[in-house]
Amino acid sequence: MAINAQEISALIKKQIEDFQPNFDVTETGIVTYIGDGIARARGLDNAMSGELLEFSNGAYGMAQNLESNDVGIIILGDFSEIREGDVVKRTGKIMEVPVGEAMIGRVVNPLGQPVDGLGEIETTATRPVETPAPGVMQRKSVFEPLQTGLKAIDALVPIGRGQRELIIGDRQTGKTSVAIDAILNQKGQDMICIYVAIGQKESTVRTQVETLRKYGALDYTIVVTASASQPSPLLFIAPYAGVAMAEEFMYNGKHVLIVYDDLSKQAVAYRELSLLLRRPPGREAYPGDVFYLHSRLLERSAKVSDALGGGSITALPFIETQAGDISAYIATNVISITDGQIFLQENLFNSGIRPAIDAGSSVSRVGGAAQIKAMKRVAGTLRLDLASYRELEAFTQFGSDLDAATQAKLNRGRRTVEVLKQPLHKPLPVEKQVVILYALTHGFLDDVPVNDILAFEEALYDYFDAHYDNLFETIRTTKDLPEEAELDAAIQAFKDQSQFK
């Protein structure tokens, strides 16, 4: 058989064209240092900031420092199996967490992995932990109230859907209790809640989860926990993982309440990472970009425009102060980023005023826009009355000769303080808050002994539930007060038949 050279040439060319290489090209580096949740690797010249990197044992890290001769990597999870000389490769991806309805009711770590022993989470949707915040034109003014169920907040420092309201105070002043009560009050409000525990004891997180489960709040809540025993990178990433889960709901037109408990511990974890990565320290040894650490997180909370679905993320970040010093570095940073702050004072807490909210230092920059009309009408002057009472109370310690008007202000002030007290885990619906504040501001409590105020309040609610439920219904549906004469008559009828005369 004759062999044709042209045929052989064509056959070889075809085989070359059809050749499929069966190997992957990946950029790899070698670990030169490992310790304290930090690795350094040489050879990853094209790595991007924030890129996910995979170690040879299956662990993941995130590129943080891109230097001329190596890359500084924070390790996400356990680093005990990583050794110097191990291979680390680029993935070309940034860190993502699982999101979606399947996450609700679960307790997860900052990587989105379940830690509640209830099995795997059935979801395929993911979102990057770092995404840009909505722009100016993508936002909408905050106008819908977020009812916390706490009279002292809903009346004095109202919070709206899409607002960022800082909760600041010393340790053991009831910060977490305020947030848990706000979550409990969202039952039936078509609200999804996310509780991010940063650097808390695992026993404390367990207690909070059991509280949420006991009151049925876990049915609409996701808990993200990075406990004190976990490496610093997980504490640093936890709030971003939480807000990524929240954004999935917000961009689908839903409303989310997210609690960061607390950002002081995140800042400390970030300081630790930055110093280990040899970044230059600044004030209080924090790195220069610690403001950006919190601003890029909190700016992702917003009320988005109708074109984007009209959803919202409301953020309640916590900051722990030392001896009530709200002028500290991290505290002033977060105060300047947020739309107001609720300041909890240790001396008020210890004197039995709980929630221990200092009305003078607390403010909401959204204000009346986030209140229903009925609450605006009954709570309009409450803050000023309380401030003048505190001033008079301090003044009267120097003398006892008081005119009748001053005495009346002091009496009203004492009753105001009592009315604003509230038992733990007993949030009140807004219509009940409106009725008791109306009774207070219209003088119905002036002749009730201060020690009987809480009993009066409970009895008033029971009486209205039994005889005047239509008034509660009017406030609920119209968001406004019923006829004043009708409300006056109902409260007077209760006083006439009770022992509080």
Swiss-Prot record:
GO terms for cellular component: plasma membrane; proton-transporting ATP synthase complex. It catalyses: ATP + H2O + 4 H(+)(in) = ADP + phosphate + 5 H(+)(out). ATP binds at G169, D170, R171, Q172, T173, G174, K175, T176. Its EC number is 7.1.2.2. The keyword Zinc does not apply. Keywords: ATP synthesis, ATP-binding, Cell membrane, CF(1), Hydrogen ion transport, Ion transport, Membrane, Nucleotide-binding, Translocase, Transport. It is found in: Cell membrane. It is an enzyme of class 7 (translocase). It comes from Streptococcus agalactiae serotype V (strain ATCC BAA-611 / 2603 V/R). The keyword Cytoplasm does not apply. HAMAP family: ATP_synth_alpha_bact. The gene is atpA. InterPro entries: ATP_synth_asu-like_sf, ATP_synth_asu_C, ATP_synth_asu_C_sf, ATP_synth_F1_a_nt-bd_dom, ATP_synth_F1_asu, ATPase_F1/V1/A1_a/bsu_N, ATPase_F1/V1/A1_a/bsu_N_sf, ATPase_F1/V1/A1_a/bsu_nucl-bd. Belongs to the ATPase alpha/beta chains family. This is ATP synthase subunit alpha. Its main location: membrane. One of its GO terms (molecular function) is ATP binding. Produces ATP from ADP in the presence of a proton gradient across the membrane. The alpha chain is a regulatory subunit.
